[in-house]
């Protein structure tokens, strides 16, 4: 602190020349010991002094700590959009990625158009018998059926017990005179005549037939034979019926009737001939139960079938093949109408719903026979 005032005083009392030298010397002395710059404010501007010697470079001090960052400046305005650059070259094809998960199932599509009708398949094997259907309502009393054909003779039955003698029947009406019978047995001897001449010895006669038993036993035996004959006929008819049915596959049984089909499709006349050769006739349902049995066969075969009835003899009057009028019918609404573009409809078909319709007899329909 004392050095500074003394320096000022020396400068003021010394001549300029010596002052400059002394200052130089003093400055050298001062600068040799410390890097201190002395600033003097002259009272008047003197002559410029000589250039002083370059001072030694002082060593740099340690770098100070960085100052705290200043506040962020405001964001500048976005620049203009540059022009679109040229399209780059295509890159190399990458490897296939992994298979993705299966997507959800789409909604079902619209039904396609119906395909053409395929050819008829082969006849399948006979299926197992179905469960018996419910008992149908009692139908109206049927007409008298046609006489059946003569059946095969059945086996001889066991000898039955002797029946009770029957009552004497009323005398029958006198029959027509029959042909001359054989020579009867010798009559009773007449009155003794006069003795004749002795004749030759005759040949021995044949043994006569055994005489009949009493009248009551004969009547009882006849009654017994009549009963056995009735049983035999029923047995023969049933045996013949089942024998014919077995030879004709795929059928339904209702009461004493059996309906069968072989799956054949024919005209009415050919269908009649086929059933006739099988010793049967076309299906003739006479009750709702029989009609239902035929309907089930129509559904199973998926084909309409012929029935036996027709009005070929009298238009509008449908009858059975025997000529009897119908005792049961199940016509569809508005049928029979005899309308097929001018072609007469004299025959009957049955639909899968059991309803009947009149059709031309030339139509090809399923054949169902009745036994």
UniProtKB/Swiss-Prot annotation:
Family assignment from sequence similarity? Belongs to the SFTPD family.
Its biological purpose: Calcium-dependent lectin-like protein which binds to a yeast cell wall extract and immune complexes through the complement component (C3bi). It is capable of binding non-reducing terminal N-acetylglucosamine, mannose, and fucose residues.
| Keyword Cell wall biogenesis/degradation in annotation | no
Signal peptide start-end: 1-20
Q: Indicate the segments forming the Collagen-like domain, all copies.
A: 46-216
- Gene3D superfamilies associated with the record: Mannose-Binding Protein A, subunit A (3.10.100.10), SFTPD helical domain (1.20.5.360)
Record region (Disordered):
47-215
CC annotations in GO: collagen trimer
Residue ranges with Low complexity bias: 71-83
Write down which residues bear the modification named 4-hydroxyproline.
78, 96, 108, 111, 129, 132, 147, 153, 171, 195
> What cystine linkages occur within this chain?
275-369, 347-361
Where are stretches of biased composition, namely Gly residues?
A: 139-148
Q: What is this protein called?
A: Conglutinin
C-type lectin domain: from which residue to which, for each copy?
273-371
What Gene Ontology molecular-function terms does this entry list? D-mannose binding
Q: Which residues carry this modification: 5-hydroxylysine?
A: 63, 87, 99, 135, 141, 159, 162, 198
**Keywords in alphabetical order:** Calcium, Collagen, Disulfide bond, Glycoprotein, Hydroxylation, Lectin, Mannose-binding, Repeat, Signal
Pfam families membership: Collagen, Lectin_C, Surfac_D-trimer
Modification(s) after translation: The hydroxylysines may be O-glycosylated.
Please list the residue ranges that the record marks as compositionally biased, kind Basic and acidic residues.
51-65
Upper classification of the organism: Eukaryota, Metazoa, Chordata, Craniata, Vertebrata
Q: Which domain of life is it from?
A: Eukaryota
